[in-house]
Each structure stands twice: as structure tokens, then as C-alpha cells.
Amino acid sequence: MSTDFLFPKIADCSYVSCYCEENVWKLCEQVKRTRPEELGKCYAVFVSNEGRTVPLWRQKAGRGDDQVVIWDYHVFFMHNPLPNRCLVFDLDTTLPFPTYFHKYVTETFRSDLALRPEHHRFFRVIPADTYLIEFSSDRRHMRRPDGSWIKPPPSYPPILSNTNTHCLGDFICMSAGKGPGSVYSLSEFVQNFYKSAHVMAQQNN
């Protein structure tokens, strides 16, 4: 992965616990600033479902040997420079940073077959340049009814677009045809972004 140093070290990335959507926005911003030619090959990926109960393994916040946690949603960054080369940058995983797509999906999401339907994972994949323009959050979802913070916010100002003050729900929503980007089931997500060298060779013959 030595040629994929979009982010030389995880320590060089902006990170605040429980603000994954902003952490990924900052990664997109960093690529636009330092490697603009790669921005068109990058994506922000939201993971959620209708009930907002998605199990993920190998997470720093997880419990037990498998480090499993159930999030209402999660967001990670993806770099897809070649048809058979896709890397995942997840600031909350215990896997390497970055991790090859197939390894990340296999260890983080495993399979929906052993899960109840209400725990099946869906993925909203948004081009990085679109995410930079359209994402907006005033962080209201991280406040209690009395106005106090559930988790301390980032020190920088809220990320606000020119047209909206808070559209996080549009990104978490997994209804096809609503919100930016494209929505996939787990199997569709894998089919779209995992192309092994063997499969590519067959397609080219």
C-alpha cells in the first residue's frame, strides 16, 4: 500500500470520537487540498438501515474478542484508484489504516445471512466532491434535551453548506432515490467495489 499514502499516518488525520461524519468530511477536504487529482476516486460511505441498528466488528468501541458494536450509523472513507484496487480508511477500526476493501468488508460486516433482517446493513456511497459541497451539520443530534453535549464536539466550527444548516438525516437515510449518492445492500456494495485480479482478467479475455 506504499503508493496509497493519501494520509501518511492516522495521526495526521482530524479525529473526534463519535463524529465520524465530520472526520470523513475532513479526510475529503485534506485530499482536495493535498491530492486534488485523486478526489474523483474517493467516496464517503454511510452505513445504516431503517431502524438505525447496524452491527460492526473490529471497532475500537466494540466489546469482546470480536470487538463488535451496534451503531445507529457509521461513516468511512474509500479510495478506489483502479477497478481492482479499493482501500478503506476507517478512523474507528482496529484494522490497519488503510485496509484493502475485501479484508475490511469481510472482517467489519461479515455477512447479513446470520443476522436478523432489522440488522442488515445498507450503504450510501457519496462521491467525495459531492460530500464536501452538500454535507451540513449543526451537531444538534449530539445534544441532550437540556442542550448539553452527549459527546464533546470538535473544536472547529460546525460544517455548514450554503443551502442547509443540518442535513445529516438525508445521508443516514437508506431509501433509494432520496439523498445524495447511491444506496446499496451489502452484497451490492461488494459487487460494485470489489473486483479481484482474477475477475478482471476474465472480463478482459
UniProtKB/Swiss-Prot annotation:
Q: What is its EC number?
A: 3.5.1.122
Which superkingdom is the protein from? Eukaryota
- Matching Pfam families: Nt_Gln_amidase
Give the matching InterPro entries. Answer: N_Gln_amidohydro_ab_roll_sf, NTAQ1, Prot_N_Gln_amidohydro_ab_roll
Q: Which GO terms describe its cellular component?
A: cytosol; nucleus
Coiled coil regions in record: none
Which keywords accompany this UniProt record? Hydrolase
Keyword Hydrolase annotated: yes
EC category name: hydrolase
Q: Name one GO molecular function term.
A: protein-N-terminal asparagine amidohydrolase activity
**Catalytic residues (UniProt):** 20, 74, 90
* Catalytic reaction annotation: N-terminal L-glutaminyl-[protein] + H2O = N-terminal L-glutamyl-[protein] + NH4(+)
Q: How does it assemble?
A: Monomer.
Name the job this protein performs: Mediates the side-chain deamidation of N-terminal glutamine residues to glutamate, an important step in N-end rule pathway of protein degradation. Conversion of the resulting N-terminal glutamine to glutamate renders the protein susceptible to arginylation, polyubiquitination and degradation as specified by the N-end rule. Does not act on substrates with internal or C-terminal glutamine and does not act on non-glutamine residues in any position.
Q: Which family does it belong to?
A: Belongs to the NTAQ1 family.
Indicate what this protein is called per its UniProt record. Answer: Protein N-terminal glutamine amidohydrolase
Q: Which organism is it from?
A: Drosophila grimshawi
